[in-house]
A protein has these predicted regions:
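C-terminal catalytic "cap/lid" subdomain
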Residues: 1-194
Length: 194
């Protein structure tokens, strides 16, 4: 399902674009693209890339259709890459919606029994990358709050599932795609619950 996700045109993220998109450019190309299209560019390694806003998702426009398809027994693929951001009366906006926040909003809007975010990491870890690293098997959103600010891919996942659990009171999991059964059974991954 091509999934449109409503965002606020007044979201502060539009004032400070930060999500990299597209190819890399040289400094000469940067000047031409900024002048021609008004793009924002930032350094990504030794090159430059375009950046766009990443506003908070507010409403999944197709949530009722998605819920109906699920109730009819269909496997629904939706919100790909965070969905298509729209504002106002449905006008597209140049932005990227965080896919984990989009998944959490979808789970909330369709009253899902829970939310599972699958990734290549098998859990949320304390002391990641050190000899003391330890998988966190179960935690509350408040206990995971320090991990929401972590650099890399795990921070947005923790933010998304923690918000979902707080708003809905239902459990969420973060775990590896290759261990989905073990994650849901509590033998792998991290369960986030109240």
């Amino acid at each position: 399902v091509l999934t449109r996700i409503k965002v606020s045109a007044d979201d502060p993220a539009f004032l400070e674009p930060e999500k990299f998109i597209g190819p890399v450019y040289s400094p000469e190309e940067q000047m031409a693209l900024e002048a021609t299209y008004g793009w924002h560019m930032k350094r990504d390694g030794k090159y430059l890339r375009r950046v766009v806003a990443s506003p908070a998702p507010r409403q999944i426009i197709e949530s009722a259709a998605i819920e109906l398809l699920l109730k009819e027994g269909h496997v629904v693929i939706c919100s790909g890459g965070g969905g298509v951001p729209v504002a106002g009366e449905g006008e597209g906006v140049e932005a990227v919606i965080d896919k984990d926040l989009a998944a959490a909003l979808l789970a909330e809007q369709i009253a899902a029994d829970g939310l599972i975010i699958l990734t290549d990491a098998d859990a949320v870890y304390e002391h990641w990358g050190t000899p003391q690293q330890r998988a966190i098997r179960q935690a509350s959103p408040d206990e995971l709050a320090p991990f929401a600010k972590a650099d890399g891919a795990m921070g947005p996942k923790v933010t998304a599932v923690s918000g979902y659990v707080k708003r809905c009171g239902k459990p969420a999991w973060i775990g590896a795609l290759s261990r989905i059964d073990d994650t849901l059974a509590g033998r792998a991954g991290t369960c986030i619950c109240l």
